[in-house]
Every structure is written in C-alpha cells, then in structure tokens.
Regions:
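N-terminal single-pass transmembrane signal-anchor helix
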Residues: 1-31, 50
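Transition segment at domain starts
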Residues: 41-50
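N-terminal helix-rich module
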Residues: 2, 22, 26-38, 42, ...
C-alpha cells in the first residue's frame, strides 16, 4: 500500500500564488482609483472651506477678498483688497497649492466664474461672480452668485 505524506505539492502552491497575484493586481488598480477619488473630494472640501472662510472674513474685516485660480499650477491665490493676503490661514504667503498638499494629483481642469478665473467677495460678503470650478474633469464645485453658497456635484 502506498501512503501519502501530508502537505502541499509544488503545483498546488504555484496555483495558489498565481490566484493571489491576480487578486492583488485587480485590487491595486481599484485602490489607486479610490485614492484619487479621496484626493479629489479632499481638494473640493478644501476649496469650499476656503470659500466659506473668505466670505466670513470679508464681512469681519470689511474688505474685499478674492481668489484667483491658476489652472496651470493647480493653485489659487488669495487677495485682500488688491494686496496678496499673505497670512490667509492654510496658505503659503497667500497661495494655496493643491499639488503641494495631500491633494497631489488633483487637476483644476477648468474655472468659469462669469467668464473669469476670479471669485470675489465684497466687504458685505456678497459673492460678485458665480460659476463652476471643475476638478479632474468629473467633480464640479458650483458657486452661486450673491450668496456664495456652493454645491459639489459629480459630472
């Protein structure tokens, strides 16, 4: 009588390794998509938080505050009246860079704020432009003129 030893054969181990490799490869591409989506949501939340803060600060300081979006550098620059707002919270000398934060890989695809790339709050907190800021071609921040209320939509 032939007895078998307990354990796994080399073929069984190779098959298990191949199956694990396929599962890991499939999940890593999905994980990358999830990571990009989290970064885009984080960037949208950062921008909308700054919009809310700028509206409040314009009323509190009784000064005009504006954002100038730069699609090429993935940044927005914040001005108080016509001067760079160098001590704006969360900025580096008035500039907020999406590529230098945890939001790297986020692209400001387009900005259309009444035909410009500038979002302005007057000293009463009134938003002088309305329009859209689009991130990575599928996340839109819609800002309403006058109220400055915003809405984040998937495209």
């Amino acid at each position: 009588m032939v007895t078998r030893s307990s354990g796994f054969s080399l073929i069984e181990l190779v098959i298990v390794m191949v199956i694990l490799g396929i599962i890991i490869a499939a999940s890593s591409s999905r994980l990358r998509d999830i990571t990009v989506n989290v970064r885009i949501n984080s960037a949208a939340n950062q921008i909308t938080s700054d919009i809310d803060q700028a509206k409040s600060m314009s009323m509190g300081r009784r000064k005009q505050i504006k954002f100038v979006f730069n699609q090429n550098n993935e940044t927005y620059t914040i001005y108080e009246e016509n001067n760079l707002f160098t001590d704006y919270p969360g900025s580096l000398n008035g500039v907020v860079s999406l590529s230098e934060t945890n939001n790297s890989g986020v692209d400001i695809t387009s900005v259309n704020l009444n035909g410009t790339n500038i979002l302005t709050f007057d000293k009463w907190g009134t938003c002088l432009q309305g329009g859209e800021i689009i991130l990575n071609q599928y996340k839109e921040i819609h800002v309403k003129k006058i109220t400055g209320f915003w809405e984040i939509k998937n495209l």
